[in-house]
Amino acid sequence: MSRYRGPRLRIVRRLGDLPGLTRKAARRSYPPGQHGQARRKRSEYAIRLEEKQKLRFNYGLSERQLVRYVKKARRMQGSTGTNLLQLLEMRLDNLVFRLGFAPTIPGARQLVNHGHVTVNGRVVDIASYNCRPGEVIGVRQREASRKLVTANLEYPGLANVPVHLDFDKNKLEAKVTGACEREWVALQINELLVVEYYSRKV
């Protein structure tokens, strides 16, 4: 299953607020489609599937990518759900978004892919790059890049920069000081349901 490129508000109406996907809010609170307002009791599978879809659409992942992250989270020590969220939060495109360099994760991915972002002073154009504590995320030293990011910082997607990012707004760079704490994950998600969804699949 490839990365979603369709109407974003349609997804927000179905799954709820997804800060990484779009900062627009749906006008209608019920899902799209002819039977969107019908009230049916959802199965446990449907509830788990919905949580999984929230994670996938918020971080802009393909199904294959998400499965890979779930497998990696299982091999790590500690809670699989917490590990999964930390892995996704430490992706370069997500950190660029959390710093306010771009209004959404798709916007951040474009910044990275177009060579506007550096890690430890070197251009990194891989959005899925896994950032580690001690690394410094910055903006390329050229006028076009800095102008673009400065404009985006006027209207950041989220109000607060997480505590694991030591951000210097004047230099347009941030040092990663550690892994993301659970309370700083912006997405409203029950990660245990995501782990349960994949428990029999991978």
Curated annotation (Swiss-Prot):
Q: Name one Pfam family in it.
A: S4
Provide the GO biological process annotations.
ribosomal small subunit biogenesis; translation
Region span, Disordered:
23-42
Q: Which Gene3D superfamilies match?
A: Ribosomal Protein S4 Delta 41, Chain A, domain 1, RNA-binding S4 domain
One GO CC annotation, please?
A: small ribosomal subunit
GO MF terms listed in the record are:
rRNA binding; structural constituent of ribosome
Keywords (A to Z) from UniProt: Ribonucleoprotein, Ribosomal protein, RNA-binding, rRNA-binding
Q: What range(s) does the S4 RNA-binding domain occupy?
A: 90-154
In its keyword annotation, does this UniProt entry include RNA-binding?
Answer: yes
State the protein's purpose. Answer: One of the primary rRNA binding proteins, it binds directly to 16S rRNA where it nucleates assembly of the body of the 30S subunit. With S5 and S12 plays an important role in translational accuracy.
- Quaternary context: Part of the 30S ribosomal subunit. Contacts protein S5. The interaction surface between S4 and S5 is involved in control of translational fidelity.
Q: Which family does it belong to?
A: Belongs to the universal ribosomal protein uS4 family.
* Protein's UniProt name: Small ribosomal subunit protein uS4
Organism expressing this protein natively: Synechococcus elongatus (strain ATCC 33912 / PCC 7942 / FACHB-805) (Anacystis nidulans R2)
